[in-house]
Amino acid sequence: MERYVTVSWSYVDSLCRKVAFQIIEDGYKPELIVALAKGGWFAARVIRDYLGCGRLVSLELDNPKFVRCNSALVVDDLINTGRTMSNALKLIKAKHTKTSALLMLQNSEFIPDYLGDYLLDYTWVVFPWNFVEDLSELILKLLKLKVELDQWELKSLLFTEFGLDPLNLEISHQGKLDDVLKVLELRGEIKRIEKSGRIYFQSLRRLRKGGDELG
């Protein structure tokens, strides 16, 4: 299975600052800051705050539209192979265009002009703005494999199956795992059960598929 790593808001902010200072020191003042949806939008907002210039727009590759301006700065959260950034550049019609990213896989074919940090090996990065979405998906995958899991089994499997250390998870996102479980419960995706003083979770998707009574 893929390996996952969570990053905190403070770490993301430090990457944004690093990228922003590179741009300022380079003397580049873009007319337009193009955020690649959806992760690039959050990074672009912070970077723009430091730059103090540039109109902010979002570019969705699933719904492509040409962007025209004199100078552009393209912002993404993560560059893996570089195909996303390369495809985005085809839609930007500007005299001057520079690229930036918070993180980049070391062996990426695309090297941005401004970069926060490298990833040595491929890892699925759980950014703060995707935390609930990504963790929900992983939890539901685990509950699909077993009828029910208690809190400790769930945390153990997040580590053994996806590399998410429970302690690091709590340090970087205090209380957020409990929030994700609560959200899934409120959405009707999972069921919380208390037995002998312990809390267990069941997937309601699995129960529905099996035709069991949900109560």
Question: What positions do the PLM features span?
Answer:
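PRPP-associated nucleotide enzymes
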Residues: 1-215
